[in-house]
Amino acid sequence: MNNLKLARFFATISKESKYVPNSGSYPLGYKVGAIHCGVKKNSTLDLAVLVSETPASAAAVFTTNKFKAAPVQVSRQILNDKNGKGISSIVVNSGNANAVTGKGGIEDALKMVDTVDSTLKNAPSSTLVMSTGVIGQRLPIDNILKGIPVALKDVGSSHEDWLRCAQGIMTTDTFPKLVSKSFEIDGRKYSLAGLAKGAGMICPNMATLLGFFVTDAPVTPGALSKILTYATDRSFNCISVDGDMSTNDTICAMANGAAGGEEISETSSQFSKIQDEITLFAQQLAQLVVRDGEGATKFITINVQDAQSYADAKKVASSIANSALFKTAMYGKDANWGRILCAVGYADADVNVLKTNVSFIPADGSAELKLLVNGEPEKVDEERASEILELEDLEIRISLGTGGGQEANFWTCDLSHEYVTINGDYRS
């Protein structure tokens, strides 16, 4: 094992101990699992399934990449045809994206759907399908179709089952991303559970990442779709690892109502409460994706304040998060605020250059380090700046000085030598 792989091995152990839960609070009425069926060359888990014991409302947000993968096309059509109703299961393979695979790829995705539905005795087209991995290669579909009944026989609802499911959708991830929580609405307890994968090709408007979260709350398809769009715009569309956009991104939500209670629609008094709960939950899950960015050593929150609109604040934050110059400076622990300001300046947003402020906000709770105040550079304590940049977590706060009072958060990571190594070796 060379030094780089050894370092990554120990980094993986460290991240797992920090971010992989030992227990969870999972929603009622779902069972999950994963097996190795032979998509990946090694023996790691590569086929994951999620099953709702009763048909559920469902919604999804898909990639904006023009080369949409076969499973994206198939799942989108299923949701459209069923108006988000009667979805019972999700099947995911990792190790092969089934993208840019022509009509054969569409047929393979449909076979995966049909095999799950027939095995579970579902109504036709009750399953959503996802794939992640190498682009441009056909799936080993026979292995997958043989594996699906095996995986479905081994589903369960324990924490270990959920963890295996999260492991089953990993590619270059160093740890499984699993989050769960319980919350109350009008005195009734509901739960959420979510899984995600994605360590590279992450940028706004959905990039190589798969995610699904499920709840036992009784949410209508229309309300769930609106909630998911809102939550995704403030979570998975506010993260960036390398600025590449994938062919496969899918974020899906299901609500089976197993916990009971009055159905929640867009006009219900409980709508805003559950929207807020799901949005915060989605942000937590999305941040785990950034923390596992390929080769990442830093988790960076970019907080843009005093913009004319939320859209402007998000544009500026995104501009900084996707700047390779900024990200490499963070890896090099270089407090080069000029790269931040440059990215602010070329974003298509209103900025008052005479009132713009830039600061580092240390993760250890110590005082902020002001870099720019009202458009004028501060005398920076380089030693203090270096101390701040030694920390794993960092917040960069920018005030645009427009008087609009709107703000947005964006989450990103640094760009390291290891990122090049990982992606150079991806197919080997």
UniProtKB/Swiss-Prot annotation:
Subcellular location: Mitochondrion matrix
Keyword Amino-acid biosynthesis attributed: yes
Protein's recorded name: Arginine biosynthesis bifunctional protein ArgJ, mitochondrial
Site (Involved in the stabilization of negative charge on the oxyanion by the formation of the oxyanion hole): residue numbering on this chain: T132, G133
Enzyme Commission designation: 2.3.1.35, 2.3.1.1
GO biological process, any: ornithine biosynthetic process
Function, in words: Catalyzes two activities which are involved in the cyclic version of arginine biosynthesis: the synthesis of acetylglutamate from glutamate and acetyl-CoA, and of ornithine by transacetylation between acetylornithine and glutamate.
Family of the protein in this entry: Belongs to the ArgJ family.
Catalytic reaction(s) noted: N(2)-acetyl-L-ornithine + L-glutamate = N-acetyl-L-glutamate + L-ornithine; L-glutamate + acetyl-CoA = N-acetyl-L-glutamate + CoA + H(+)
Domain of life the protein comes from: Eukaryota
Note: This protein may be expected to contain an N-terminal transit peptide but none has been predicted.
Taxonomic lineage: Eukaryota, Fungi, Dikarya, Ascomycota, Saccharomycotina
MF terms in GO: glutamate N-acetyltransferase activity; L-glutamate N-acetyltransferase activity
Family matches, as PANTHER family: ARGININE BIOSYNTHESIS BIFUNCTIONAL PROTEIN ARGJ (PTHR23100), ARGININE BIOSYNTHESIS BIFUNCTIONAL PROTEIN ARGJ, MITOCHONDRIAL (PTHR23100:SF0)
